[in-house]
Amino acid sequence: MADRLTQLQDTVNQQAEHFCNAIGVIQQTSLPSKFVNFERIGPQTPIPCPPQEDYAQLFAQLIARCAKDIDTLIESLPNEDSSIELQNSSLKRLEIENQGTARDLEEVVQKGELLLEKMQYSLECIAQAQLDMQITLKHDLQ
């Protein structure tokens, strides 16, 4: 549960980052507004900065994707309606399933160890046979 909450917090933080970045790009690329009774100091016509990319589309996609991720994570959290009995029965079921899987794993490990022993014995036999052949060849060549 804490893992999902951490993911949710990270995603919410990422969404906040997207909003801040979008506002920053808007500030950089937009033209300043004129206010009544306010004299501007400096150049009267600001030089517009042409946007390099379609930032509106990019940030819209990022924000929408992040919102979907947040919804998915929220949906994956457990309900408050689930009773303690229901949670306990789920835990018991998972524990029984885990025990069965552990037994299966032990059997597979035992079979693997037997196969390993057989393979090691076979490799020893092959190595011994090769040594015997080399000795025989040396005696035959002499």
UniProtKB/Swiss-Prot annotation:
Task: Provide a GO CC annotation, any one.
Answer: nucleus
Q: Name residues in a coiled coil.
A: 87-111
Q: What domain of life is recorded for the organism?
A: Eukaryota
Where does this chain mainly localize?
Answer: nucleus
Q: Which UniProt keywords apply?
A: Activator, Coiled coil, Nucleus, Transcription, Transcription regulation
Question: Where does the UniProt annotation locate this protein?
Answer: Nucleus
**One GO term of the biological process aspect:** regulation of transcription by RNA polymerase II
Q: Name one GO molecular function term.
A: transcription coregulator activity
On assembly, the entry states: Component of the Mediator complex, which includes at least MED4, MED6, MED14, MED17, MED18, MED20, MED21, MED23, MED24, MED27, MED30 and MED31. Also interacts with MED7 and MED10.
Function, in words: Component of the Mediator complex, a coactivator involved in the regulated transcription of nearly all RNA polymerase II-dependent genes. Mediator functions as a bridge to convey information from gene-specific regulatory proteins to the basal RNA polymerase II transcription machinery. Mediator is recruited to promoters by direct interactions with regulatory proteins and serves as a scaffold for the assembly of a functional preinitiation complex with RNA polymerase II and the general transcription factors. Required for activated transcription of the MtnA, MtnB and MtnD genes.
Name by which UniProt lists this protein? Mediator of RNA polymerase II transcription subunit 21
Which organism is this entry from? Drosophila melanogaster
Kindly list the organism's lineage: Eukaryota, Metazoa, Ecdysozoa, Arthropoda, Hexapoda
What gene is behind this protein? Answer: MED21
